[in-house]
């Protein structure tokens, strides 16, 4: 099974808190048990290996355990946020969804089957090699969103390496690879994920104080709002050790203000693409936007001012566009 390594970690840490959701502490034992229950439910619902499943929700107990169970079943997963339905019809049509699973804000689960039978060549390839798939969508800011198809087993490889983990606020959405990357990194290292009812500065400040959160992954837009709202004077944020930022451009002025407001907190820029995953990064200084990307499993080069990336976890391709690859196998 492609996630045996995860469940080995879960079993070793079964009594530890894996998730804090709506103030409730969920242990690793819950995810062991619940994933097994979903596997039985899949039999009833006709969800077999290779089935294309849209999973809509947030980082709730049922949604996370369903996500893990779908990987274990070698399904092709389209993660969808239950707070962002922009362009949903286009995405559903592109991805040839065969089954919808919905997790509402109270973590109730509903199922809906379609009459579609997926037949895209990339899906057929995943079925042939008996691997789970993951479909991620671009933002669509310059046109229709692109649907990137991954062999999920290759993306999971990096989570097999032991790394330091934190009590982490899973700020980014469920349909964002940054959010899924944070979740998988935390769970694979027996850390604790804390989820938010909403992503307002006050809610985040309250959660940091109550749960002694150490790592806050966020967007520059939110971090600017956090500074403007003055939550550092309303809540005790002393537990924070690291703030990571990405998903959109950071202004130098905002970064300087962050460093001044939180001089003891490490500020780290992240870099990722739906086509290759999240790369390891290194900055000159916390208040510098200069960034070196790469790390284990990634090769980089610059050709005529354009970044090229090579990694085993590069997408199989897009469902609805040509994949920009060089003749010698680099993603452009």
Task: Identify the function of each model-found stretch.
Residues 306-332:
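Conserved ATP-binding/catalytic segment of the ANL
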Residues 7, 15-46, 150:
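Conserved AMP-binding/adenylate-forming core of the ANL superfamily
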